[in-house]
């Protein structure tokens, strides 16, 4: 599961970029960024984001998800509750700290619309994160997954290696687009099926 957690975001990002490129929704830059430069930035991102995500995943999974599991709630309720609280926690960041131009670079919509779309995204992501936690009973695969999300996507956009066409950003935005979000949901539901089949075998 550790390897899966490490590979989820790079794999989904690669698929989304390739689909976007084939449909004209994504352009790969002609910039002369070397692999060495990208790997250097990637490693710096991994180091810094790893520390931040220890604290974040300690709250969302090690505490919140763990407490909700003790209440014997349905899977759907857990996904939605964790997704909602995780989403609402981002309210100050999106409504105050993010500039209009930064939001527009991700998705060409207004601030409030961007925030509301975020709930759908976090709800879908929470399926994946919740199921990884239930499979492993460990914080660390989640820290790894969350770190890779920040580390892989940010350099691609900041270094302008990948450019998403505004007219198709709703589909191919690497962080909130429909295509990657559906892929992350599929990953989460697949892990859920794996967990349930494993539990049946153990009964």
Residue spans for each PLM region:
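Interfacial transmembrane-helix boundary/kink motif in multi-pass membrane proteins
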Residues: 1-18, 28-41, 66-81, 171, ...
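Residue-level signature of the transmembrane alpha-helical core
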Residues: 6, 42, 46, 50, ...
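Aromatic-anchored segments of alpha-helical transmembrane domains
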Residues: 9-15, 84-93, 147-157
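Membrane-interface helix termini and inter-helical loops of multi-pass transporters
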Residues: 21-33, 99-107, 158-168
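Membrane-interface helix/loop boundary segments of multi-pass membrane proteins
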Residues: 55-88, 101, 134-138
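Membrane-interface interhelical connector segments
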Residues: 64, 94-111
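Alpha-helical transmembrane segments in multipass membrane proteins, preferentially the mid-helix core
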Residues: 121-135
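C-terminal membrane module of polytopic membrane proteins
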Residues: 135-137, 147-203
């Amino acid at each position: 599961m550790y390897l899966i957690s490490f590979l989820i975001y790079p794999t989904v990002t690669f698929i989304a970029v390739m689909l976007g490129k084939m449909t004209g929704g994504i352009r790969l830059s002609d910039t002369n960024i070397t692999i060495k430069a990208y790997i250097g930035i990637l490693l710096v991102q991994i180091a810094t984001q790893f520390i931040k995500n220890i604290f974040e995943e300690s709250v969302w999974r090690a505490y919140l998800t763990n407490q909700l599991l003790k209440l014997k709630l349905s899977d759907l309720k857990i996904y939605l509750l964790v997704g909602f609280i995780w989403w609402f926690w981002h309210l100050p960041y999106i409504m105050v700290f993010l500039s209009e131009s930064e939001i527009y670079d991700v998705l060409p919509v207004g601030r409030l619309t961007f925030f509301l779309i975020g709930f759908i995204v976090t709800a879908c992501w929470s399926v994946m994160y919740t199921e990884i936690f239930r499979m492993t009973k460990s914080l660390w695969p989640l820290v790894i997954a969350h770190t890779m999300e920040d580390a892989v996507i940010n350099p691609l956009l900041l270094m302008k290696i990948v450019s998403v066409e505004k007219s198709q950003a709703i589909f191919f935005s690497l962080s909130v687009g429909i295509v990657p979000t559906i892929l992350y949901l599929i990953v989460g539901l697949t892990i859920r099926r794996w967990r349930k089949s494993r539990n049946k075998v153990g009964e």
